[in-house]
């Protein structure tokens, strides 16, 4: 059953819980490091053959239930006219950040089919090698992309972002609409290239108060989801939304219209699922640091998550964030094998609800 992941996204019964891991292709893998020694990060992202090779590495190494295209959320911003580099020890840097309404007005219209064509080519290459295993495309969410564009890189407090949001609300919503259009078109293009599902990463939205999320973010993310569904119709894929520190936004996340909501490790899975509503599938939620623990503790924590899911159709096992750089490879393999061998309950009230 190679479609376990897609079936779980749609809350359909599966024979076991599917598992894939955010940042499953990364520096913790010696195969990845061997490639990284020869190429810069952006060169890897922008060379379809290399991106495809790296995407496939964890499939060969661990047999996870889905691949996620090797890419990054920020390169699509280059099509708008933002200058992006990745600096050693500093991470992504945008050299002409958005600080004034004029900066928003002068952003270039762009078509990601042209400006991020390398990722779409990588999707096509990977799709040919997966033999029916699902491929996940992704994008940053409008808010997270706006935060990077305004801050000029990462941030801990997002002071510039929030000040722009509060002090320039008209320009803020203009920026979010432009980014929403970019995100929707990028996701649609990935599906057209062969992606079977898409994930929207809203890495920094957990910094917002619920009132601010409702006022400045919610409708723009809703529009992305609605646009993807409307444009693709019956071909629309499962849509996943993920952010960290989102437990206080459960009421807002229920309104996004996505199929799957990601859960980080700061809330128990069953509590989050009840808050999000059982009309959603959920994805998560092992603390990435747990993979540094002894195998018996990894098993204990994974078992608890699976028990909290209770066999209800619609659980995709994942971490609550990306795999960390120095994670032991053998612990990743142990986790995948443990989850894939864990027996689902043969009868549960949740399963009976779906099958009736």
From Swiss-Prot:
Keyword Cytoplasm: yes
Coiled coil, from the record: none
Location, primary (coarse class): cytoplasm
EC number: 4.1.1.37
Enzyme class at the top of the EC tree: lyase
A cellular-component GO term for this protein: cytosol
Reactions mediated catalytically: uroporphyrinogen III + 4 H(+) = coproporphyrinogen III + 4 CO2
Cellular localization per UniProt: Cytoplasm
Any GO BP annotation: protoporphyrinogen IX biosynthetic process
PROSITE patterns xrefs: UROD_1, UROD_2
Pathway stated in the Swiss-Prot or TrEMBL entry: Porphyrin-containing compound metabolism; protoporphyrin-IX biosynthesis; coproporphyrinogen-III from 5-aminolevulinate: step 4/4
Record's keyword terms, sorted: Cytoplasm, Decarboxylase, Lyase, Porphyrin biosynthesis
Role this protein plays: Catalyzes the decarboxylation of four acetate groups of uroporphyrinogen-III to yield coproporphyrinogen-III.
NCBIfam families cross-referenced by the UniProt entry: hemE
Subunit structure: Homodimer.
HAMAP family (UniProt xref): URO_D
Name of protein: Uroporphyrinogen decarboxylase
Organism: Chloroflexus aggregans (strain MD-66 / DSM 9485)
Organism phylogeny: Bacteria, Bacillati, Chloroflexota, Chloroflexia, Chloroflexales
Gene: hemE
